């Protein structure tokens, strides 16, 4: 209750927290420029680096994703399930664990992907597959 003659201080405007990619998120990122047979244009990208790193450095470390069917036989591609909507509806998405990359996500205009957060089991499998190649820790 407010006493007579007193007014409530206006509440501070809510600050909108800027979006920053986080570990285990799928984002859209522009892979251009590219060289040779590298993936080009805008593609989904699985984020491996933690939010605090991404925010402070403007870099994001992760793995590109594709719906190219020939990856079904690729031992370093992990199936991430089927696309629920959009022009790729019903197509299987693959995380390409043999192609780790880093990008400046701010400069490249990264955006959240409709997939959102990759399921824990799929994320763990992608990390394990990558570690078979780079053999971190141990």
Describe the residue ranges of each PLM region:
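Conserved functional hotspots at enzyme active or ligand-binding sites that engage polyanionic ligands
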Residues: 1-138
């Amino acid at each position: 209750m407010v006493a007579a003659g007193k007014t409530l201080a206006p509440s501070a405007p809510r600050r909108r927290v800027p979006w920053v990619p986080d570990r285990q998120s799928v984002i859209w990122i522009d892979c251009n420029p590219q060289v040779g047979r590298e993936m080009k244009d805008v593609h989904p990208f699985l984020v491996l680096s933690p939010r605090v790193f991404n925010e402070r450095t403007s870099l994001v470390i992760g793995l590109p994703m594709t719906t190219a069917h020939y990856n079904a036989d690729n031992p370093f591609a992990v199936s991430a399930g089927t696309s629920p909507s959009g022009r790729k509806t019903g197509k299987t998405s693959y995380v390409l664990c043999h192609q780790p990359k880093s990008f400046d996500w701010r400069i490249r205009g990264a955006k959240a992907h409709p997939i959102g957060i990759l399921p824990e089991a799929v994320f763990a499998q992608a990390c394990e597959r990558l570690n078979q190649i780079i053999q971190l820790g141990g």
